[in-house]
């Protein structure tokens, strides 16, 4: 039977999940000094065959991760990761076991928060309107300065609660990822409240999430 993979964790604790993707049973098993979580999907086409089905399945997938995150730190598989059977899953884990083992130890007892910054005045610009090279460079420098200002403020106010920051640009927004020990959650939220408004920027916080952006060590990520 095809398997849909959720995540791997430390071998203990084992988290019992009532319902998984497509209302299936969530199975967990210890293997290779890890614990894997998955569901058997008898008919992937009916479960994931159209946009609405995929949307519902994604909600259920994230609900499973949230329940696991409440008790331990999951290292998620990209949704949807479907494998042919348990033998194929074992082979995948064996192929990446060192990465997974390192990740579950390094990220043990951590959470991830995300902050997305947008600049409303910039979003109202007409991307189709031609601009000169000088104007383009000016706008680019202004955008970099805006990002740098937010970056500096976030890191300054949260220095005592965040273990590591990562970020990436997106179309008309910039996204930051904060990795923090589970016990620093309230302190982190409180520190953001002290930051005050960022001029011209709108910030949106979400989380906590599994620390998926930090699975690869920084030296390999950069």
Stretch-by-stretch model annotation:
Residues 1-222:
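An interfacial alpha-helical scaffold signature
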